[in-house]
Amino acid sequence: MGAAYLGVPCTVKNRPALDAAYLPFAPWRDAYLKEAHRPVRIAVERQEGQVAVFDTRLRGVTDPADLRFLERTVKLLLWSVGGWRVRICGCDGLTRRLADIYGSHGSRAFDASLMETVFRRPFTLESVEERDFPAARSGARKIGGHLGGCRIGFDAGGSDRKVSAVINGEMVYAEEVVWHPKTQPD
């Protein structure tokens, strides 16, 4: 089934019955990228100088579709890798508009504020030249192994559900109940 969003035609295989106007981002993004040839680089800096770099393309006509694609891509990166500083290379005008969107009165102010809270740094979104674009940098971090305090675990499986609780690494509660949610009516 054909659809168009911001002048980019795309195909959607299944339309939801309760919201036929809904257009998932993925088919639109795929169609958009078929028309995109202008390289753009996005760097998201997070703790300890770690930088995630994402290379993509824009159509390069500075239209609402370019802005929407860039905005969605930055939001995806913020929510998937996190960061307090976003640097974009290859589209100065769109980056300025995006900085307003992520500003204190913009539609993505919540995202910027959350990143400031998480990383304890002012959130910035800026345009940079290629010579100033940072290289990707990551570091290994040990995760898990924290046994102090109270923890609870829950697993709702297809045939049973399990609950367990520990205090300072010692199990204080465990329960497993046979449960068949797939065969139960809604």
Located regions from the model:
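Intrinsically disordered, low-structural-confidence terminal and linker regions
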Residues: 1-26
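Generic recognition of cysteine residues
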Residues: 10, 89-91, 150
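Short glycine-rich, Thr/Ser-proximal phosphate-binding strand/loop in the N-terminal lobe
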Residues: 19, 28-32, 38-63, 156-186
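Flexible, charged surface loops at secondary-structure boundaries
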Residues: 33-36, 76-83, 145-147
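Low-complexity, highly charged intrinsically disordered N-terminal segments
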Residues: 60-112
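Short glycine-aspartate micro-motif
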Residues: 85-87, 149-155
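Non-catalytic propeptide/linker segments at domain boundaries
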Residues: 98-149
